[in-house]
Every structure is written in C-alpha cells, then in structure tokens.
Amino acid sequence: MTRLYTEEFSSEQLVCSTCPHFEECGSCQLQHISDEHYKTWKADRLKTLLAENELEIEEWLEPVFISEGGRRRVTLNALRHENEVFIGYNKYHSHDLAPIKNCLLLTPQLQSIVEKLPQALKNIAHKNHAIELLVQEADGGLFDCVITGLDETGARQTGSIAAMAEQCGLARISFRKDAFSKCETQVSLTPIKKTNGAITVDLPAAAFLQPSAAGEAALIDAVLQGLSRHKLGKKDKVADLFSGCGTFAGHLLNKYTVHAAEGDWAMANSLVEAAKGHARFSAEVRDLFKEPIVGRELRDYKAAVFDPPRAGAKEQAQMLAKSNLPVVIGVSCNPSTFARDAKILLAGGYKLKTIQMVDQFTWSTHTELVGVFEK
C-alpha cells in the first residue's frame, strides 16, 4: 500500500487513482489526492521545510508542475522466474518487486520500450537473479539502456543483447556490475548525443539527464532568470558546478563565458571534448566534495550555479559563502540538503532572493527547486 499521508487529507480531497498498479507499486505515493490539493500540499510542504530551517526568502515564484506522461528516463527492476521476466518498481519501503504493465509517468516512446523488455530479457536475465535497468532518451529519439547486476557475457548472450537492442529500439546497451562500476558497452548501433544550448556532447552510458524535457526547460529558465537580474555579458565568467553533461553550461554559454566542473569522469570528459573549439567554454574533471573551487579561484567569476546530487554541496557551499560573487544559484532535488547549504550561504552574507519550485517528480513526495542568492 502506497497511500501515504492519507491522514493529512479530508475525504473530499481524495480521489480514485487512475493507475492499476498504485496499490502495490512504490513509485508514486500521491495519486489518490485531487490535483488541486496535490499542488497545494507539495508547495506548502516545501515552504514548511524551509521555514523550519529559519530561511528568510524574499519572494516565492509561481511553482511549476510537470504533468504525467513526460518522463524520458526510468530505472526499473527485473526478475526472471522460470521462463517469465517481470518488470517493475520496488514496493514501497521494500525490496520486493511490484510488476507493472504500464506506467502513466512515462512518455509514450519510453512506455513502448518498457512493454517489450520482458520478452527481450528472457535469454539475458538469469533465473531468480534481480537486475536493474536504466533506460533514457537522448537527442533524436535515441534510447540508451544500462543493465546493472549482470556482467557475464558470452557469444550466445552477445547475440541476445543485439537482438534486444533491435527488438526494443535501443541505440546502446551497456552492462555494469553495480552503480559504482564502469559501464561496459555491449551493443552500440548509433552514436548517442545530447545537445544543451550551445554545446553537443557524446552522451556517456548512465549519464545523468533531467527526468523530463519539460522539467529540464523549467530549471534552465529559472537559472537564466536568476542571472538576468544582473548586468552580465559574454565576457563575464560563470561557474557551473556539478555540471553533469552540461544541462546548464550550454545555455549559459549563449550569454556568458562558462567554466564547468564535474566529478564523474565520463560526464566531465564529454564536456572537455565538447569545449574544444569554444573560446568561452572550458571544463574539468573535479570532485567538488573533496576539492571544492575555493575563493582565490572564484575571484575572476561573476556568478556560480551549483546542481549537486541529493547529498547536497556542503563543502562547495562553504567556499562560495566566503566569496564575493554577486549571485549564486542553487539547484536541488533534495530540499533538506538545500536548506543546509542555504544556511551556510546566508551565514556568509548572502540573501535568499527567490525560490522557484519545479515539481517534475509527479505524484511523489519529492520535489526540485532553484534558489537565487545575492550578496
């Protein structure tokens, strides 16, 4: 049962879920709330969390809500039992699989691939051995797939993997032992690229992409709007920290001089290669948890954008707080660690000017936000 927080809502606020898997699947928690009350609850929950952390916010911008049917990346679990493969999400607070036939969150193209996976995996998945699949869409409707927990290959299996790529419409399939292991490409039918504003990267396997194109656009717009409050030109340097494959860097490059720093070697290297030939763009492989950009390096910059993973950016926030950057923009998928990092920036003399909530984790308790800090 995934009907969370039911005690917080009156019976008038509850609705019947349109998803047949809602009672078992652990992916969505809030499908049983009316759309109006869902949006109010999401926004109020974020405001309450930040207020509890004693953050003074000058302006709350109108929240952005991304509707279902737009998710272009998904992580699924698969389990083969006898000659049948079951695909789905884990049950809520459990490692047990909740098989699904379809998911209302996904784009039609991604849903079509998910429907074909059970048959395609029959000759690849081992009996009673759970595996994880990441499938995501890049430029041109090309799909990348990474299978975690299955690292054995052989002539027969290689043929099955190639057949899976053809059957499911996957441009590339890679294996990795676990989430921390290097991806080993098994089949690559077409080069996969991702264009972000002024740059195009060769997308590494398992590279991070925002869950939805609409959510990505909303976050980019929020960042650019935050910087537009300041009179910066193409010669002014902006640091893009925890840059991934350049989601923000490429769009910043249209207006400013940009330096990107990313700790994941594959993603950072894709930016290093993309930077060749760009006079106003540079990139480096840098673990910002262990080696944050410090004050003396920030002297030449006019702004910084940071978009860390869920763990936040404590070490980097401490360095930014000591800087004299007129504007720092934080993007976060975890309001709790954002609040911690924001308190560090405020203690360093920054003011939290605006908060923009972007809800692209539809029907879940998670949300994303963009905060603009000024000094």
Residue ranges and their predicted role:
Residues 68-72, 141, 365-366:
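A short, glycine/Asx- and small/polar-enriched loop/turn
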Residues 3-9, 123, 152-375:
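Rossmann-like S-adenosyl-L-methionine
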Residues 77-81, 136-140, 374:
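Short beta-strand micro-motifs enriched in acidic
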Residues 96-131, 137-139, 151-174:
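Internal alpha/beta scaffold segment
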Residues 4-17, 23-128:
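Extended interfacial segments that mediate partner engagement and assembly in macromolecular machines
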Residues 60-67, 132-136, 178-182, 356-360:
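Short, solvent-exposed loop/turn elements at beta->coil junctions and helix N-caps
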Residues 65-72, 135-136, 240, 245:
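Feature of Fe-S/electron-transfer and energy-metabolism proteins
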Residues 82-91, 141-148, 181-183:
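Short, well-ordered strand-loop elements centered on a beta-strand within folded domains, enriched
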